[in-house]
Amino acid sequence: GKICLSDDINALMNEANVGAEKMYQAGLQCIRRNSATGKYYFIENSSDRKIEDWIPLRTEARSAAIFNPMTGASGLAAMKRNDGQTDVYLELNPGETVIVSTSGQHFTGDAYAYYQNAGEPNPVSGSWTVSFVQGGPQLPASITVDSLGSWTDFVGDEYKSFSGTAVYTTTINKAPVADVIKLDLGSVAENASVYLNGDYIGTVIDSPYQLYIPAEKFKGQDELVVRVANSMANRIAYM
């Protein structure tokens, strides 16, 4: 071993053969740990733009796998070797995170699902019924609205002071035109669980509030339910 002294942190890192990860130049941040067969990367998109690109990892690998801790999606990453490093293709919205596992061994399994937009966004049109199912200080009356929005914008103090859970329900009459449909809920305060025709699709608790739904779950006339729970801020303000 040896002790190195310098005022230049980059020089010290180079001397110790600890190289910087180039992904930081793309607006990504990571925590890197060694594993028995390779490395683990916890990667966050800390920029304000979506990342859809090949991202270099400072490691040599034969295989790489991606796991999304928020959605549970996982699979083998698209990757390529490049001059002693490994490039992995990532799609990350601002604030989104994934875990990438690299290995000198050959992984087998399903490929990680990457998505490309098949066309322009198609808004969910029609009315929504909003029912308040749990919370207080009292349960407001159900209401029908023309578009999704915060219940604090509804007319009436009972809506503005309500903290709890409300269920937004609508009917979709358009058949999907792609293999997978991305449902973008926009801004949610604070979390939302989505059901299609009674089937649980998933829960979102942070931005981006998006879920991917296989086209085969749609029947042509579909009931979409969004169960939203907010924080206690409204009720505290009421008190």
Label for each model-derived stretch:
Residues 1-165, 173-180, 199-204, 212-214, ...:
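Carbohydrate-binding surfaces of carbohydrate-active enzymes
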Residues 172, 176-192, 224-226:
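A short beta-strand element within beta-rich, extracytoplasmic domains
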Residues 160, 186, 237:
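Flexible, active-site-adjacent loop/turn segments at secondary-structure boundaries
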